[in-house]
Amino acid sequence: MLMILLFQRLGIIMILAFLLVNNSYFRQLIEERSKREKLVLIIIFGIFVIISNMTGIEITSDKSLVERPILTTISHSDSLANTRTLVITTASLVGGPLVGTVVGFIGGVHRFFQGNFSGAFYIVSSALVGYISGRLGDQLKTNNLYPSTSQVIVISIIAESIQMLFVGFFTGWDLVKLIFIPMMLLNSLGSTLFLAILKTYLSNERQLRAVQTRDVLDLTQQTLPYLRQGLSQQSATKVCNIIKQHTNFDAVGLTDRTNVLAHIGVGQDHHIAGQAVKTDLSKSVILNGQPQIALDKTAIACPDQSCLLNSAIVVPLKINNETVGALKMYFSGDKKMTEVEENLALGLAQIFSGQLAIGIAEEQNKLANIAEIKALQSQINPHFFFNAINTISALIRLDANKARYALMQLSTFFRTSLQGGQDREISLEQEKAHVDAYMNLEKLRFPDKYQLDYHITVSTKMTLPPFGLQVLVENAVRHAFKERKKDNHICISITDQGEFYKVAVSDNGQGISPNMIDKLGQETVSESKGTGTALVNLNNRLNLLYGSASQLHFDSTDQGTTVWYEIPYQKGDKDEHFNS
């Protein structure tokens, strides 16, 4: 009889658990485990543990079972069979020792007051169960995954055994004989079911992210040749066809700021290339530069009453933070836009914006000085690009979040590279973002191999040549450390020297050979890992911009190398400063 009643209570807890795990906010909480997330988990499981106490089975002093819907109080001589230990164990496995201990303490305190100030030992036993379960769970985790089913069962048995030891010592072993087997089975089964549900959801989510990232990469590779041609009707039609073939959208469109460039799928009979943008939704996105989602025809606001498009996401395409068009994805019929489609559209728009920037830069390059542009373009090392792509491809299978992060870093790197190719000078902030993107990608390839530090005490308005830091940092990464696997430090220093800024990049590498150092920055060299063209190009641009006094200097010993140059002050340089 007790077993049946307890399993009824288990059903209540499992229903609540299913509703909880089905919530994306809760799944985010358990993956991050910051202080704020732990506090929220304590609140959630604290409520659960109180519910467990209040839905328990009352056992009188003569071992009779009393079933009441809600147990607000019980006699000090009575006991409870409940799911409290199950909730505490689950909280510990999900949130760790701290969450488990606090939830156990909450459950024990509530049980103490529920029993008319009897059973103080429950406070200690419940907190101890939470701590031990959490510690065991953390130690048994592999690859940031939860313990296996067999391990969860063992932890649950240990947790229930601890609780029963306290019950036996303080209330008598007859009660333990009555409730131990049902409670142990209940706790083991409940914890296993909860973790199984949770792991299934998390696994599906990770697989979905991996698929999304792979889809974005596939679409990026296929659309790159067309978007680099710029936004035209011909290139837009090719891109829309590719997206339509590789997604489940019913229609895909591209616009510039005023006209439809292409519309493939449902509605192409009246969303016609070359005509003005029709829908209020698209006009609003282009005007405000913010993505918008429409969940019905009214929100899309197409003037054609026969239009079958029922939901949409429209995302701006931007170059240098200026909206140049919009990517539009539609569903018809009863299909609705979900978070999956939203993330796909946002990711594509960001990548497409970068591809368009590449196209614009290439067009401008044709009109610029060919020799200088070739030198600038040499900064985007093709080996670095292919290494980054290979890293992202590997991460897709291992860690979708890291793959997405790497993709964004690569996008930042190329965007800042292309902006640098258009300008004679850029801000220190822009150059720093370029360096950070480069190093973040290198750190993904070689975790723990490099450490980059900044010592910057100058104005945020300071300008310097494009690649004025990145070239030197990349030079250190490629040449300074040879095969050394760790303790490789690079420091960027920009300081105020009175009449000029001193820009220096130092490393603790193995130094530069004396017969090589006089050639660097002055002429190309023959070396297995490069020719020094980037250093020559940077040195020439320093001379052109600031005169012969500003050129690369190399100080090197077997303890490391410092490469530095000077930049004269410019008006407004001392208004704002970094804190690095």
Swiss-Prot record:
InterPro entries: Bact_2-comp_sensor_kinase (IPR050640), GAF-like_dom_sf (IPR029016), HATPase_C_sf (IPR036890), Sig_transdc_His_kin_internal (IPR010559), Sig_transdc_His_kinase_LytS_TM (IPR011620). The keyword Amino-acid biosynthesis does not apply. It holds the Pfam family 5TM-5TMR_LYT. It is found in: Cell membrane. The keyword Kinase applies. It is a multi-pass membrane protein. Its EC number is 2.7.13.3. The modification Phosphohistidine is found at residue 383. Residues 356-571 form the Histidine kinase domain. Keywords: ATP-binding, Cell membrane, Kinase, Membrane, Nucleotide-binding, Phosphoprotein, Transferase, Transmembrane, Transmembrane helix, Two-component regulatory system. One of its GO terms (molecular function) is ATP binding. GO terms for cellular component: plasma membrane. This is Sensor protein LytS.
